[in-house]
Amino acid sequence: MTDQQKRSRIHRWLGVVATLAVLGTVAVATGPATTTAQAGPGREDTAPRHRDAVQRSLDELVRADDFPAALASVRERDGRVRHYTAGVADLRTRAKVPTDGYVRIGSNTKTYLAVVVLQLVGEGRIGLDEPVETYLPGLVRGDGVDGRRITVRQLLQHTSGLPNYTALLPETYELIRHRYVQPRELLDMGLSQQATDEPGGTFAYSNTNYVVAGLLVERVTGRPVREEITNRIITPLGLRHTYFPNVGDQEVRRPHPNGYHRDRPEQPLTDVTVMDPSMGWAAGQVVATPSDLNRFFTALLGGELLGPGQLRQMRDTVDAPGPLPGSRYGLGLQSTPMSCGGLAWGHGGNIFGYSTVNAVTDDGRAATIAATRLPTDLAEVEHLLAALDTALCG
């Protein structure tokens, strides 16, 4: 395997394919699973056919794709919420998967950060079409990279041309699993590579964009990104099961399914639940439950976090080529056509140990599917997305 192939594989694992939203069909099978349906106090689940289809899709992820566990939270148009699980939380003890357990949500963090930036835009403290240089003078410079020519909008929309720092992370995960990485180190890794395009060019997903956006937020507000996301989003929405881990916090709060990883498909799985998530920072560090993730995206699309003008900007998309036809990317938000018609809005995220796909619709549906290892090929990604489509379209 060449160095470029190794980098491409890590690049894929850390969020490129996982930012894609929803499309596909799902196979049917059975496997070890548990199901919990919750629709609020005293309300009965009246959609067994849809419920069974979602459960079968999770069972198939465990049986056919060998994900240790899969879990889902689905919100219907009428507000009913149902939770699903399949597999086991711990491969050693065979413990039951906790209903709506905590997972690392990876690149979904980008949407939280984009909301913070857009709130600051609404407050007149950041200009979307201002150059990055205005806020971070002299910081963003490299081979074909110049912060004087890159706007804040281009950062959030992945049209800046900034190269992706994850391409230079070590191939062997254990080398960095417990190491704290400074945000400036992540930026330096990105800037050590050549620009991928001119600013304002084609969409090219790069975690480096959101490292720069995080540094920009800290410079403008004088506070850590963690505090801004907590104070502006998590606390106001009452997201009691969402948090941005503090420096040195390597645990995932309980209850959670364990996360697993292998560097190559032929290797045995290693428990990587305990890890330093700083390699993701403002691009991928948040932890949440599936239902909290649904609540966040539902609130966002419902206008609870941004004014109408900022939300319109967020939903103004460019073509985002990838394995899903019709996918488009806005400002930290992706849209994808659903098999049942209409658009799904979400993001998705991969980080070592966990993969999440999620989306909400304009009519109030929301779904998050989480699996407890990273997909290792495109087929597994498609199966995760198919499970999400089943949850939204039934």
Question: What is the predicted role of each segment?
Answer:
Residues 65-68, 92-153, 197-206, 281:
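Short active-site loop at a secondary-structure junction
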Residues 58, 78-79, 110-113, 117, ...:
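Residue-level preference for non-acidic, small/hydrophobic
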Residues 77, 89-91, 160-161:
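Solvent-exposed coil/turn segments that connect beta secondary-structure elements
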Residues 2-3, 32-85, 270-394:
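Catalytic loop of the DD-peptidase/beta-lactamase superfamily, centered on the K-T-G motif
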Residues 53, 69, 127-131, 147, ...:
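Alpha-helix N-cap and coil->helix boundary residues
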Residues 1-39:
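Secretory targeting and sorting signals
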Residues 83, 143-344:
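Short, surface-exposed loop or secondary-structure junction motifs
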Residues 50, 54, 105, 109, ...:
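Hydrophobic (often cysteine-bearing) scaffold residues that line and stabilize catalytic clefts
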